Amino acid sequence: MIKSELVARLAQANPHLYQRDVERIVSTIFDEISAALARGDRVELRGFGAFSVKSRPARTGRNPRTGEPVHVDEKSVPFFKTGKELRERLNNADIADDKLMVDDSDDGDD
């Protein structure tokens, strides 16, 4: 699924929202996650997973064409660890279909 497909599915599941508003919301979420990671923060979405940044040390690699050693600088890379609920859902044999599932059970009337 690409970003435009995500926006279209969310807009379809929420007909009270305009697609352009959904697109702004999705873009803002991605921008905020990116900004938090750039600051070195961890972003946790309970039940889904956590985004963090890991540091890869400098090392000596090899040029695949020549076999010649090359220096690879230290770098930071994004890392995603799945949450327990997502892992269970992915490993559950009775995943019904490809529909977007929205949990409307908690409507805040408790």
UniProtKB/Swiss-Prot annotation:
Q: Name one GO biological process term.
A: regulation of translation
| SUPFAM superfamilies documented for this protein | IHF-like DNA-binding proteins
Q: Which GO terms describe its molecular function?
A: DNA binding; structural constituent of chromatin
KW Transcription regulation (keyword) present? yes
Cited HAMAP family? IHF_beta
Subunit: Heterodimer of an alpha and a beta chain.
Q: What is this protein called?
A: Integration host factor subunit beta
Q: Which organism is it from?
A: Parvibaculum lavamentivorans (strain DS-1 / DSM 13023 / NCIMB 13966)
